[in-house]
Amino acid sequence: MKIISDIQELRDHLRGQNRASFVPTMGNLHEGHLSLMRLARQHGDPVVASIFVNRLQFGPNEDFDSYPRTMQADIDKLEKEGVYILFAPTERDLYPQPQEYRVDPPQQLGDILEGEFRPGFFKGVCTVVLKLFSCVQPKVAVFGKKDYQQLMIIHQMAKQFALPVEIIPGETIRAEDGLALSSRNGYLSAEERAEAPELIKALKEVRQRVLDSNIRDAKTISEIEKLAVASLAGRGWKLDYIAIRQQSNLAPASNEQLQAGDPLVILTAAKLGKTRLIDNLEI
């Protein structure tokens, strides 16, 4: 596996080859990331992965400085997966001048849910992803469904900018007890880790209530959301949101859309101690 930090060197290595299958990451790799590498390979070699902890998507009180950086362990894992190139730029490589131009997703998608609680997050994500796409020029790029809203925003960005890349969704990988794998799970204490699977259990209960009730009105949807928030809050969680939304655009479903049976997704973000976890479940 070649490890490259310079943009021009990366382009030189990729010139004359089939366009790559690309998986962007922030490192601290786990089985969820590795499953995306395998999915990328199904869409063709060479597979290019990137590791870059992107300052632009962290807020002033978030964990940029403490975000786990495990480069050597990540290299070992990527080599075992047969990744052709690891693109690991420094901040100076990717942002040689201050990044004055940003990609700002539309408010109706970028300022809701995660965007409401992490202002500027998706602007930072879209900016770095567009820049990485420019560097790698991939044929396909794989993003995990665990970051459901991010996946949708990247897909829409690629479509609206007519980027010649297909966005491929990868399924969420979970621990045996159901907790979605995440680099931030390492922040959990032993007691918190034992409690953490209650998040996906709550989403499954929400899904079952929706299915059992054959819900067709927005008021009942709101009541189910409030019940789930109260249930987790009673266990010590601090909820940012539990929201039942349309899969197509993450907007709240109208009565007419509910009656038409439009596909829904449940999304959540919640803090357990100091650790903020996100998850989702399609209905």
Swiss-Prot record:
- GO annotations under biological process? pantothenate biosynthetic process
Q: Where is the active site?
A: H33
Q: What else is known?
A: The reaction proceeds by a bi uni uni bi ping pong mechanism.
Entry binding sites for beta-alanine = Q57
Taxonomy of the source species: Bacteria, Pseudomonadati, Pseudomonadota, Betaproteobacteria, Burkholderiales
Task: Could you list this entry's UniProt keywords, alphabetically sorted.
Answer: ATP-binding, Cytoplasm, Ligase, Nucleotide-binding, Pantothenate biosynthesis
Q: Which reaction does it catalyse?
A: (R)-pantoate + beta-alanine + ATP = (R)-pantothenate + AMP + diphosphate + H(+)
InterPro entries the record matches: Cyt_trans-like, Pantoate_ligase, Pantoate_ligase_C, Rossmann-like_a/b/a_fold
Query: Would the keyword Disulfide bond be found if you checked this record's keyword annotation?
Result: no
Q: Name one GO molecular function term.
A: ATP binding
Family label: Belongs to the pantothenate synthetase family.
Please describe the quaternary structure of this protein.
Homodimer.
Q: What is this protein called?
A: Pantothenate synthetase
Query: At which positions is (R)-pantoate bound?
Result: Q57, Q150
The question of whether Transcription is a record keyword is answered with no
EC number(s) recorded for this UniProt protein: 6.3.2.1
For this record, the Gene Ontology CC terms, alphabetical, are:
cytosol
